[in-house]
């Protein structure tokens, strides 16, 4: 039995006003080829197949086309909902996709299922655990402390997994079949990136790995960096196939090819996803940034590299942005983000705490507030325009009063 474990596709993501359609299309074509090459029996997508609950039409088209193409290979598809996914939207096509060897599990309550091999013989028992919404598991009661609510949710998730595992064992009987489980949540010690949202805000920070049942493999989603959980080789995050924030650059993206034999886990191979849209982060003062930009001088690069430029000086971002624009005009790069480093933002905030509003001009207050916000050039220019117009209007009113 072979499965491909993947997650966090985030189809339809808008990346600083840029579409990821071409990247996702290339990834799905690559994934389809790997499923055929390795004669995979099932692909498990552990949540966040879409980036929003109302994905654009092209994202739905990519999803539906992949289902049809995969069905023609004899490989099954299991789609679990993540915290970004809409239960209602996924359930819209669930019954139709079932005829195309695709199982969609959008919410809690789905019992374990049998995953067949390509030849139709039983291959594994699967516990299809999607993102578990607190309202599906616990009843909120007035008067409970934050600690009590945290423990209540922790026990509810643990109990749900144990119940799934017991049902899976009953379904397996004495057959030598592996038990596979899924999940879409943060585990204790997992390394997160900027694009990962907290999903149990105010109740549960992370789920302890020791509370998972003794399944042969646990395919997790939600964390965008591929990693083993708690030193347990059979509990893994596949990570996202694309970098979903600039702080995810520099590390390869992948899916896991998981093999079972004699009812047990036998091997996990990491398959690296090819890069179709390069991203890069450069940091420093203007001189350092100028030097780093030279690495693309004379390079033929298509598509252009998407850049995040982090400024480590106290100069006005607006002035630096104009200089960076001039520096990059003839380079195969596209600057999506210019921002201050976190250290500089904290320093500005600290200095601001020692000042009063009466010491600052209105324009300075606006610029400092803008410096703390990560937005693209187009929005920044629009905000400057709106601010200037508003200030002019107010000044004119004062003069005419």
Annotate each PLM feature.
Residues 1-68, 72, 385, 389, ...:
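N-terminal active-site segment of His-dependent metallophosphoesterases
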Residues 62-74, 204-214:
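Catalytic-core regions built around general acid/base machinery
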Residues 37, 42, 260-401:
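Accessory, non-catalytic peripheral segments of nucleic-acid enzymes
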Residues 8, 28, 43, 48, ...:
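Divalent metal-coordination and catalytic microenvironments
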Residues 55, 84-234:
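His/Asp/Glu-rich metal-coordinating catalytic cores
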Residues 71-79, 303-306:
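Short, surface-exposed connector motifs at secondary-structure boundaries
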Residues 111-123, 129, 237-299:
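Binuclear metal-dependent phosphoesterase catalytic core
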């Amino acid at each position: 039995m072979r499965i491909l474990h993947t997650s966090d596709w985030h189809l339809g993501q808008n990346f600083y006003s840029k579409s990821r359609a071409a990247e996702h299309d290339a990834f799905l074509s690559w994934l389809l080829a790997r499923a055929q090459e390795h004669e995979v029996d099932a692909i498990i997508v552990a949540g966040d197949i879409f980036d929003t609950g109302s994905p654009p039409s092209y994202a739905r088209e990519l999803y539906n086309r992949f289902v049809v193409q995969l069905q023609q290979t004899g490989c099954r598809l299991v789609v679990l909902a993540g915290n970004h996914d809409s239960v209602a939207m996924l359930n819209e096509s669930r019954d139709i996709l079932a005829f195309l060897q695709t199982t969609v599990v959008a919410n809690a309550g789905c019992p374990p299922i049998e995953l067949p091999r390509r030849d139709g013989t039983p291959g594994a028992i699967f516990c299809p655990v999607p993102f578990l919404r607190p309202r599906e598991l616990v009843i909120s009661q007035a008067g409970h402390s934050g600690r009590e609510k945290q423990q209540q949710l922790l026990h509810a998730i643990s109990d749900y997994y144990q119940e799934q595992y017991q049902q899976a064992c009953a379904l397996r009987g004495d057959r030598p079949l592996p038990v596979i489980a899924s999940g879409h949540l943060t585990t204790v010690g997992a390394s997160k990136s900027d694009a990962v949202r907290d999903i149990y805000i105010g109740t549960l920070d992370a789920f302890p790995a020791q509370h998972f049942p003794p399944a042969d493999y646990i395919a997790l989603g939600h964390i965008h960096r591929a990693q083993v959980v708690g030193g347990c080789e059979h509990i893994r995050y596949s990570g996202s196939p694309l970098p979903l924030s600039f702080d995810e650059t520099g590390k390869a993206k992948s899916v896991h090819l998981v093999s079972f034999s004699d009812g047990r886990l036998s091997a996990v191979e990491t398959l690296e996803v090819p890069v179709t849209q390069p991203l890069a982060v450069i940091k420093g003062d203007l001189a350092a940034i100028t030097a780093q930009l030279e690495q693309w001088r004379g390079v033929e690069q298509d598509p252009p590299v998407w850049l995040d430029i982090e400024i480590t000086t106290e100069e006005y971002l607006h002035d630096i942005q104009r200089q960076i624009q001039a520096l990059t005009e003839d380079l195969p790069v596209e600057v999506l983000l210019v921002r201050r480093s976190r250290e500089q933002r904290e320093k500005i905030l600290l200095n601001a705490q020692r000042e009063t509003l009466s010491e600052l001009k209105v324009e300075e207050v606006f610029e400092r507030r803008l410096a703390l916000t990560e937005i693209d050039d187009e929005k920044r220019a629009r905000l400057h325009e709106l601010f200037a117009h508003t200030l002019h209007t107010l000044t004119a009113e004062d003069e005419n009063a």
